[in-house]
C-alpha cells in the first residue's frame, strides 16, 4: 500500500465539477493499493500517518501530528501510485489491485483514519475520475510504502 501525504492549508476533490470532499489545514492523502495488500497494511499505515509529526510547533519545528493540531484529512484513491515505468514510455499498472480487492481496503483505510483523528475524514469516490485542488503548505510531501517498513 502506497500513500503520498501532503501537508495542506486547504484541499478539495471534485467529480464532474461538483465538490465531494474539502478540508482546511491538515493532510491530503493519495492512497494506492496493490494485490498483496491486506488489513495489516491498513492498520500500520493509518497509525503511521496519524502520528507523523509534520506540523510546526510554537518554535517552528515539525513536531506535531495532524491529531495534535486537530487537523483534517482528505483521502483520494489513486491506483497510478503503483505505476511501473521500467519498460517503454507507457506506464504499466499491473501491480495495482483490482477494484474488488482494493475498494474494501480503501474503505477500511477511511474507517481506521476516522477512528484515529477527531474530525470526519473527507473523501473522493473510489474509482471515479476526479479533480484535486490543494495548497501544499511548506511544501511538505511524504511518500510511504508499507512494503518498506523496516
Give, region by region, the residue ranges found by the protein language model.
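A charged helix-plus-loop insertion that forms the helical arch/lid used to bind
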Residues: 87-101
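N-terminal, polar/charged subdomain of small-to-medium soluble alpha/beta proteins
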Residues: 1-89, 104-150
